[in-house]
Amino acid sequence: MKKLTSAQVRRMFLEFFQEKGHAVEPSASLIPVDDPSLLWINSGVATLKKYFDGRIVPENPRICIVPENPRICNAQKSIRTNDIENVGKTARHHTFFEMLGNFSIGDYFKREAIHWAWEFLTSDKWIGFDPERLSVTVHPEDEEAYNIWRNEIGLPEERIIRLEGNFWDIGEGPSGPNTEIFYDRGEAFGNDPNDPELYPGGENDRYLEVWNLVFSQFNHNPDGTYTPLPKKNIDTGMGLERMCSILQDVPTNFETDLFLPIIRATEQIAGERYGEDPDKDVAFKVIADHIRAVTFAIGDGALPSNEGRGYVLRRLLRRAVRYAKHIGIDRPFMYELVPVVGEIMHDYYPEVKEKADFIARVIRTEEERFHETLHEGLAILAEVIEKAKEQGSDVIPGEEAFRLYDTYGFPIELTEEYAAEAGMTVDHAGFEREMERQRERARAARQDVDSMQVQGGVLGDIKDESRFVGYDELVAASTVIAIVKDGRLVEEVKAGEEAQIIVDVTPFYAESGGQIADQGVFESETGTAVVKDVQKAPNGQHLHAIIVERGTVKKGSRYTARVDEAKRMRIVKNHTATHLLHQALKDVLGRHVNQAGSLVAPDRLRFDFTHFGQVKPEELERIEAIVNEQIWKSLPVDIFYKPLEEAKAMGAMALFGEKYGDIVRVVKVGDYSLELCGGCHVPNTSAIGLFKIVSESGIGAGTRRIEAVTGEAAYRFMSEQLAILQEAAQKLKTSPKELNARLDGLFAELKELERENESLAARLAHMEAEHLTRQVKDVNGVPVLAAKVQANDMNQLRAMADDLKQKLGTAVIVLASAQGGKVQLIAAVTDDLVKKGFHAGKLVKEVASRCGGGGGGRPDLAQAGGKDPSKVGEALGYVETWVKSVS
């Protein structure tokens, strides 16, 4: 057996299957594209569904024996978080891992799959395992696989184990038996003859599964029966981390070259050693695992947030930070490990090193935010725990746990952990109810499902070609080839009716890539229809949503299709300006900026992009200036088609989530911008005229948004802004040029008046305090003052309370003011009475509760608020009762 690095194992696997006629499918992004069923890519086959279900035929004619039934292999990065609590506590559980796999869509089957697996594992040219250390499992009814292993490979019967569990089935759809290959690590990992699990396929550390070969040969029907598939498929998976643990002769995956450098770097930060304390080792493993997952996920475009995959990232980071405390790390540090991950993985994933600065910045920001959250959330949680205990409960209400999560970003797992330390539990069912209510609110806020999706079944049957000519022509002669109304195919629609139509030739752009659809009309002597929207149908045709204004629209009839030219011209100006803006953002803010969404409409453009931190006003000015400079340079806009890899090599920006074929459309704006784009553009930047940013804001963690206008809309916007400026200057009796100086003068005057007002208020408060000293009562030998006073804000109340403490020397004081339907309360206790057990925080909390509020604070000074001014007298009356209860 060879001792190989992880990079060598990965490379060797792909080279082996290339020799067997397989095309190497590049590792796809962890974020699924066009697969809403998955939060993350979680297996090697997950990215190949499009091939297995026949939606796409892989292009591999050069090396495939049967071109339409190709052979594929890959090394696919994956994330699974369903066993997150086991990560760090077992030898082989991970959130991020790599699957090496070979696949066949209707080409070879069991014989080749088994023979090639055996060759790769045992040949001295490849892995070189001792065949005596290998065992396999098969399904009891899979005689074909059994006979191949027994009669062709030559495995002895005792090393072929029949297991009922060797059947891959996820419900309706393809399914079939599988065979798993196990490596015997030796007696050091298990030698108890009485252990019922000590066999290949059992729960033990001795026999390690290294490869799973799935033979997809049946279809699981809705009625529960199984029928043979017309084309049989192969789907295999080998975990890289597990294979490396064997080849590098280490006890767990965490000692391989995929993890150990991260652990060593963490040792330097922590000042602790891995391998000396099992509990601390868990922390090292959690950190090493989670930083891999977070680094790759952010590199692929995910960002921490409170929902979906963003919440998974946030949870992983926060779990690692929590475990870091066990090894003495109490500061942001995870970001320092990003370059280590990049160095380990650069052989196959060079993009991690390229994006390391951005990834580290995102992680550091999230870590810093969590340390703040931890401090604030723990204070709130302490109050919640105290309140529950006062009520005699050992359960934190689900509503409170959800408030901590929703308002303060405090993870439910963290709440449960701290609750357990306090001897309490969390009402998890109540938390889930609140979470579901929030989801329902979100669902209700969403727009209805797109009609094309609803009618996908009907549209999916329409195979006729629809040719788009709208790049060059805004008017075309079109024949209607299909009409869909209320989810059914019809022959015609009449005046006043709405429908969707597909035509053979169309100049109307279908909404995609952020550019909204064209509008316009279909017209002929027999009828006119207004085009309201255009979307892509499942088979790629342009689907026009129309309302018939006059006459009828019939299938097979010919119409003149006419795009609204004025709207299209405004759209193309905004689209080309969006490309200029994208490049300008990279130039000013950094190469980490990536498009996160866009809208190109006739009246404006909206551009969402990844960037942590605020965009400074001077940066925004520079971005706007750069875009206008490119417009005024009159740069030509050239559009051409290139092979995808050649376009990327030229530096063309490919946008995440967009699907590209082998040949792509490249939009080149002078020498300034180069992007892959299927949208419509101006022929020259001078046609845009003017670019003006209207707003810039944050729309989520690490995501910013710019809205802008161009051309006539930019001119109108600037004219409106100038009119507002002139009106403001007129009201202040100055000119627009002198407006700033005039405002500076007014602010200085206002500040002086505020100082005078504060001085006057302080004198009045002093006078009122003098008057209040006459209202002090003796309660069991304790001077008590509880009074309603006039005060503008809490600062005045506090100043009054401090003054009274000075004047009285010893006293319990509660002051209340009521304004605008709200109550403000302050409680003060002199130091001598604090020593006797009087507590301002507890007192003000009781008083506030009697006028519909709450609060608290220190023993000597505390404040609170209330919602019912009518109860102030009653609340103040309680002060004497409280003092009696303490004294």
UniProtKB/Swiss-Prot annotation:
Gene3D superfamilies for the chain: 2.40.30.130, 3.10.310.40, 3.30.54.20, 6.10.250.550, Bira Bifunctional Protein, Domain 2, Threonyl-trna Synthetase, Chain A, domain 2
Question: Which positions does UniProt annotate for Zn(2+) binding?
Answer: H575, H579, C677, H681
Which reaction does this enzyme catalyse, per its entry? tRNA(Ala) + L-alanine + ATP = L-alanyl-tRNA(Ala) + AMP + diphosphate
Q: Which GO terms describe its biological process?
A: alanyl-tRNA aminoacylation
The EC designation for this entry is 6.1.1.7
Q: What cofactor does its activity depend on?
A: Zn(2+)
* Database matches in HAMAP family: Ala_tRNA_synth_B
PANTHER family in alphabetical order: ALANINE--TRNA LIGASE, CYTOPLASMIC (PTHR11777:SF9), ALANYL-TRNA SYNTHETASE (PTHR11777)
Q: What is the protein's given name?
A: Alanine--tRNA ligase
**Record organism:** Geobacillus kaustophilus (strain HTA426)
